[in-house]
């Protein structure tokens, strides 16, 4: 594939007056990026409507599994726009397939001047993984750097091992996707041609090796 230089925006730096983390803060939401918040379901309950409105929340991503639907609910569908994802906090759950739609949802909100809250149940594993993935793709970051950035703002995050593995894999996936999006049709065609030519060369090499091996066997038999 031809070299395509990807450019990413600068990552906002941590506020100098950032509040020191205390245990009770895990039950509240924190602003990870300007306009992007991460928290537990308790930060999106009916009793927290004044807090949500105070922070200017307009969009909410609610992450839950089916058995949690009885108590984790989109409580303000008349006031906020919701994206509800049915995802279990299970290491074998495929979360990569949901990353594109969540990025589109968050980008759409921020571009129109809105603010987004991403929450699961505890705001530690599932929702944290999605915020990390968003930061990775938006700012061109590796998993470990995006994790550290989010943890500076919400110290209690701890995506399960399966989610961590998928986030580490996602780096190559989003870079390849963005590279293809940046390439012109001619560049893509050239890259495919180069790849095809390389494959053909390898095939010819293997065929030549097979022919040479056959000749050696025939010579040995005749000798």
Swiss-Prot record:
Keywords: Cytoplasm, Nucleus, Phosphoprotein
SUPFAM superfamilies: (Phosphotyrosine protein) phosphatases II
Pfam families named in the record: DSPc
Species of provenance: Homo sapiens
Modified residues (Phosphoserine): 184, 193, 201
Location of region: Disordered: 197-223
UniProt-listed GO biological process terms: negative regulation of protein binding; negative regulation of SCF-dependent proteasomal ubiquitin-dependent catabolic process; regulation of ERK1 and ERK2 cascade
Localization terms from the record: Nucleus; Cytoplasm, Cytosol
Function noted in UniProt: Catalytically inactive phosphatase. Acts as a nuclear anchor for MAPK1/MAPK3 (ERK1/ERK2). Modulates cell-fate decisions and cell migration by spatiotemporal regulation of MAPK1/MAPK3 (ERK1/ERK2). By binding to the F-box of FBXW7, prevents the assembly of FBXW7 into the SCF E3 ubiquitin-protein ligase complex, and thereby inhibits degradation of its substrates. Plays a role in spermatogenesis.
UniProt keyword annotation of Transit peptide present: no
MF GO annotations: F-box domain binding; pseudophosphatase activity
Complex and partners: Interacts with MAPK1; independently of MAPK1 phosphorylation status. Interacts with CARHSP1/Crhsp-24. Interacts (via FQQ motif) with FBXW7 isoforms 1 (via F-box domain) and 3 (via F-box domain); the interaction is direct and prevents FBXW7 interaction with SKP1, a component of the SCF(FBXW7) complex. Does not interact with FBXW7 isoform 2.
Family: Belongs to the protein-tyrosine phosphatase family. Non-receptor class subfamily.
Short motif (Interaction with FBXW7): ranges: 76-78
Any one of the GO CC terms: nucleus
Name of the protein in its database record: Serine/threonine/tyrosine-interacting protein
UniProt keyword annotation of Lipid biosynthesis present: no
PANTHER family, A to Z: SERINE/THREONINE/TYROSINE-INTERACTING PROTEIN (PTHR46588), SERINE_THREONINE_TYROSINE-INTERACTING PROTEIN (PTHR46588:SF1)
Tyrosine-protein phosphatase domain ranges (all copies): 28-176
């Amino acid at each position: 594939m031809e070299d395509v230089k990807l450019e990413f925006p600068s990552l906002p730096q941590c506020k100098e007056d950032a509040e020191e983390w205390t245990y009770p803060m895990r039950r509240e939401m924190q602003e990870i990026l300007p306009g992007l918040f991460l928290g537990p379901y308790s930060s999106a309950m009916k009793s927290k409507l004044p807090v949500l409105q105070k922070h200017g929340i307009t969009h909410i991503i609610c992450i839950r599994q089916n058995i949690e639907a009885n108590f984790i609910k989109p409580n303000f569908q008349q006031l906020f726009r919701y994206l509800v994802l049915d995802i279990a906090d299970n290491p074998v759950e495929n979360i990569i397939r949901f990353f594109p739609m969540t990025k589109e949802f968050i980008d759409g909100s921020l571009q129109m001047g809105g603010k987004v809250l991403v929450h699961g149940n505890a705001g530690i594993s599932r929702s944290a993984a999605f915020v990390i993935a968003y930061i990775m793709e938006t700012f061109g970051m590796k998993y470990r750097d995006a994790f550290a950035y989010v943890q500076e703002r919400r110290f209690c995050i701890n995506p399960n091992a399966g989610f961590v593995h998928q986030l580490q894999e996602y780096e190559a996936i989003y870079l390849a996707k963005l590279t293809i999006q940046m390439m012109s049709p001619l560049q893509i065609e050239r890259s495919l041609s180069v790849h095809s030519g390389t494959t053909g060369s390898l095939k010819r090499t293997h065929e030549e090796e097979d022919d040479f091996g056959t000749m050696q066997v025939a010579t040995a038999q005749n000798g």
